[in-house]
C-alpha cells in the first residue's frame, strides 16, 4: 500500500509541474500577443528624432515617371520635413509582395550621409520596411509633384 501511495504522490507532483509549465507558457504567449498588439496599433511619426535644420537635402525618385530630382532649398526642405513630422501614421498592412511606388524619398545631412529613407505612395500612405502606414491625408505628395515639375524641367 505504501508503494501505491508513493506512486500516486509522484504522479501528482509530475502533474503539478506540468500544470505550472502550461501556465507559464500560456502567460508568456499572452504577454507577447498583448505587446505585439500594442506595438501594432501605436502611431508612428517619421523623422521624429531629426531636427529639420539638420536635413540639408532631399533626393526623390518618382516611381511613376522614372524621374529623379534633388533639392536643397532651405524652405522647401523644411516644408517637406515638417509636413512629415506633423503627420501621425498608423501601421496598416504588410507591404511584402507589393510592386511599384510613388515617391522614394531620402533625407541627407550636411555631410551627405543618409538620415532616413522611405516611400510616399499618396497623400495618406507611407511605405517603410515591412508595412504600409496610413493617415487621414495631408502628406506633401502633391507638393512633391510640384517640386518634380520645377526641378526636372
List the model feature ranges, each with a label.
Residues 11-14, 18-153:
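Function-determining sites in protein domains
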